[in-house]
Curated annotation (Swiss-Prot):
GO terms for molecular function: rRNA binding; structural constituent of ribosome. This is Large ribosomal subunit protein uL15. Belongs to the universal ribosomal protein uL15 family. Keywords: Ribonucleoprotein, Ribosomal protein, RNA-binding, rRNA-binding. Pfam families: Ribosomal_L27A. One of its GO terms (biological process) is translation. It comes from the Bacteria. The gene is rplO. Binds to the 23S rRNA. NCBIfam families: rplO_bact. InterPro entries: Ribosomal_uL15, Ribosomal_uL15/eL18, Ribosomal_uL15/eL18_sf, Ribosomal_uL15_bac-type. Part of the 50S ribosomal subunit. Residues 21-49 are annotated as: Disordered. GO terms for cellular component: cytosolic large ribosomal subunit.
């Protein structure tokens, strides 16, 4: 049995197509190499995005204006109504509890005043609207804002 070495490896017969050698003699891909006679396409490839005499697409589209503030803080919102559905008996609700109700693992939370408070909540969130704080405090609860 012969020892197999890397330089002995060959692809299976018929699995690889032979490279077409253009411009070698007067066969099918000889002389003009299948490019026809004269013209731009016979001489050099046309660059991507070139549209002939027409204004190219990338020049007809307006440039982006303004800027994006990378320090902007995005808040996930939760309403009092949804909070009451998740915790009907009220009690202490932490920021992590609120995040699990929203269905996110990270980020900031803002409490909004949509809905009515019927039970006492001691809630901790990153931010809360003034109306939401008023509704919870009127039901003898407290709102702690982290930010």
């Amino acid at each position: 049995m012969r020892l197999i070495k890397l330089h002995h490896l060959r692809p299976a017969p018929g699995s690889r197509r032979a490279r077409i050698r253009v411009g070698r003699g007067e066969g099918s891909k000889g002389k003009t190499a299948g490019r026809g006679t004269k013209g731009t396409k016979a001489r050099a490839p046309v660059r991507p995005g070139f549209a002939g005499g027409q204004i190219p697409l990338h020049m007809s589209i307006p440039k982006l204006k303004g800027f994006k503030n990378h320090k902007k803080v995005e808040y996930s919102v939760i309403s009092i109504k949804r909070l009451c559905e998740a915790y009907p008996s009220g009690g202490v609700v932490t920021r992590d509890n609120v995040m699990s109700v929203i269905g996110k693992k990270r980020g900031f939370v803002k409490l909004l005043s949509d809905g009515e408070v019927t039970v006492k909540f001691d809630i901790t969130v990153d931010k809360a609207s003034a109306a939401a704080v008023e509704k919870i405090t009127s039901a003898a609860g407290t709102v702690t804002q982290a930010r």
